[in-house]
Amino acid sequence: MASGAPDGKWKVVKKGKKSGEKGGGRKALSESNVTPGGTAPIKMANTVYEMGFEQILKKQNKEQVPPNNIPAEQPQKKQQQQQNPGRKKPQSGDTGSRQRKFHTLEEGLKALDLAELQRELEKSQNMFPESPSIWVKDLAGYLNYKLQTVKNDVLIQQSHDYPYCLVNKELKGIVRSLLAKAPHVLDVMVDHCIFSMFQELDKPTGESLHGYRICLQAVLLDKPKTVTNNLPKYLELLRSQVNRPMKCLAVMWAVGQAGFTDLSEGLKVWLGLMFPVLGVKTLTPYAILYLDRLLLAHSNLTKGFGMIGPKDFFPLLDFAFMPNNSLTSSQQENLRNLYPRLKVLAFGATPESTLHTYFPSFLSRVTPSCPAEMRKELINSLTDCLNKDPLSFSVWRQLYTKHLSQSSFLLQHLVETWDSNSKAMRKSVRETVHSFKVTNGEFSGKGSSLKDLEACDAACQALLHKMKGSGFPWRRLIVIAFVFLFGFVFYDVRTHNSFQASTSHKVLQQSGLLSVSQQAWSKVSNYSLQGQSWLERNVPQYYSQAVEVLGPVLEQVWAKTQEGAAYACEKGSVLITYTKDNLPRLIEWLHSHTPDSVCQFIEYLRELLLHLHRTYLLPAVTYLEAAVQNAWQQYVASCNGKVTWDCVRGQVSNISHSSWTYLQNTTMTVTNWALSIISHH
């Protein structure tokens, strides 16, 4: 059996030789397999040692022991075969000892003998009870040896959980059971799988890597911290293999599996391992693809709040929007599509207390040479900072003199969007603009940035003008008019000692308003008196009848309601207790008895819905919005640019007339067609 050592190399455990045996030291395994000429091939025993690790042991023993002459080993080989007839090996040239390759991984998984796997794992545990690292290495080697396919699958073209999604529950249970027995050597297993993948990638025609990948996913989907606690080690490994893209992609894929069950761990992996190599031509596509899959797998971004700070966010912003960087245009476009979700992650759950820390970096990037798309994004982000975090205004006032050109762009944007700003923001902008006006007066005629200062001053003037003329004060005008009218009437009545002798009474009487108001008041008074008298006569009678008829019923209803509420509370508490006790068992039972086909169907359905959402629903909504906007513009144009009630009435009349005419014509056409058919018969 292959045994693990503290240095991570393979060693061979062999039985001790008898004193009478003669040999020139320890022989390599490939040398001991050489049989005398004419000997028939020996059937290979079905053990993990002989099947899963024979090739690895041959290579390791050849490296550890220099080969001796073959003729000197043949007597010893015969003696070993006589002593251990059950441990015979086939000739090195025997093609029957090779594991056959399957056309697809699904075929290999269906053909896998789980009972044999269980026996080999038990044998490994019995032989090395104190070395769990050997158990997990045996598991990885056995699975990879048994799951060989004719063609290696391209992982970028597969789902993020491939190939583990193809594994049935029985095999998953065996793997998880063994991993649970060796929790302290999971990092050893991860490193073993990665370096075994490296060895296969070094070969011109290396074997498939499905077994190693399945073991990596089994570990990291359950214990992601196995790799996220050692990210610097894997980053160093990645940089050491930067000229070997396939090895780098193997490391990125392996470590990236830690992120699909926990968004925070996935962001750790991306920021610590993949972001540093963003821009490397051969690695950038997978880094962006992994980020896309990670954010797609976690629709709830709240678990990732706090993982991205200004130190990581602004380099991402530059990669997404700055031209002439190391990304291609399509890669930049993909990163820009992910940028809104990265922005949400960066701002976190409480943007009102964190956005002021992003404000300086946003402001410093709004330069005259900044691309238009990036400038638009920066200006919108600065506006969000000012609108959500009031501390951003104080930060802006401190940076104003050092960033005059950038401030002019932001001030001009505030002028253009003044009407859409909130009242709280308008108040803060007013105070800030007054502060800027004072600063502009102090720096006027000084320094070399006179042009930028003039642009800022002009924008401040425009903002002040907007503040003064933001709209006609109808409310104030109505209040003032009411107060003035009340004061005039009060003064008029006081001057003439009575309302009948006042000028106000004469004006109201001449205009007819007084008589109309008197008639209205008399009618209101009359109806009020009638209503009051009716209520006085009928309310006591109706109330007594209602109490007599509905009183017993309401009492019974109230009593039944109390009893029902008490019964519901009692049964509800019992049901809640029962659910708490049995829900985990139910979940476990469903998990163990649900067919894999159901899980695959749900996954396929999810992918289908996502495809429909992206391919059909979003374009349909966009088309509908454009159609509605176009229809509205045509309607406004038909009204000569002014939507009035007369225009609406005319449009409705035209539509009704057109519909009625069309209905009449259709009816006549159908009638004529029916009559012609009848007449022919």
Swiss-Prot record:
TM spans (from-to): 471-491, 608-628
Membrane-related topology note: Multi-pass membrane protein
SUPFAM superfamilies, sorted: ARM repeat
UniProt KW Endoplasmic reticulum keyword: yes
GO BP, sorted A to Z: apoptotic process
Stretch list, region Disordered: 1-41, 58-99
Glycosylation sites noted in the Swiss-Prot or TrEMBL record: N300, N324
Functional summary from the UniProt entry: Critical mediator, in cooperation with CASP4, of endoplasmic reticulum-stress induced apoptosis. Required or the activation of CASP4 following endoplasmic reticulum stress.
Protein's name in the database: Transmembrane protein 214-A
Native source species: Xenopus laevis (African clawed frog)
Organism classification: Eukaryota, Metazoa, Chordata, Craniata, Vertebrata
Gene: tmem214-a
